[in-house]
Amino acid sequence: MRIAIYPGTFDPVTNGHLDILKRATEFFDEVIVAVAVDSNKTTLFSLEERIQLLETAAEELSQVKIRGFEGLTVEFARQCGANAIIRGLRAMQDFEYEFQLALMNKKLAADIETIFLMTQSEFSFISSSSIKWAASLKGNISEFVPPHVERAIYKKYHPEIDD
């Protein structure tokens, strides 16, 4: 069985993340979305909330599982029996960072490959940070995230607004 993990903080999950996830399922029997606990980042959503948002977003993808993790990505990959790490790339800036990360992961776990998938052009500018920024200013984010994620973000930033 070919198993990959797709790690990230997913705060929040975006349509760009989902595009990479759907495309990854074409290459692997199982893709585990590895939702990271990152003590270096302040997240809008708790780990449990991020997992729930992803489970709802990926409910039609039968070979996808969602799990939280803390620690080294390659160690989590080993625990899951995965032999690949999926990473999405939007631009050159992503590549430089991701390339360094992939080299470090290869040194730590030579048996685990990092596979880069380029985002579709319509998602190349989307980031969780920019979506949160726009939502905090009551901007329209409906084309960047699934509807349930949009509602959850607005509830966080603007609890006074009804659905």
Swiss-Prot record:
Sites where the protein binds ATP: 9-10, 17, 88-90, 98, 123-129
CDD domains to which the protein is assigned, alphabetical: PPAT
GO molecular function: ATP binding; pantetheine-phosphate adenylyltransferase activity
Taxonomic placement: Bacteria, Bacillati, Bacillota, Clostridia, Eubacteriales
EC class (word): transferase
Necessary cofactors: Mg(2+)
Site residues, Transition state stabilizer: 17
GO cellular component: cytoplasm
InterPro entries: Cyt_trans-like, PPAT, Rossmann-like_a/b/a_fold
UniProt name for this protein: Phosphopantetheine adenylyltransferase
PANTHER family noted in UniProt: PHOSPHOPANTETHEINE ADENYLYLTRANSFERASE (PTHR21342:SF1)
Keyword Isomerase: no
Residues given in the record as substrate binding sites: 9, 41, 73, 87
EC number: 2.7.7.3
Keywords on record: ATP-binding, Coenzyme A biosynthesis, Cytoplasm, Magnesium, Nucleotide-binding, Nucleotidyltransferase, Transferase
Intracellular or extracellular location(s): Cytoplasm
Quaternary assembly: Homohexamer.
Organism per entry: Desulfitobacterium hafniense (strain Y51)
One Gene Ontology term from the biological process aspect of the record: coenzyme A biosynthetic process
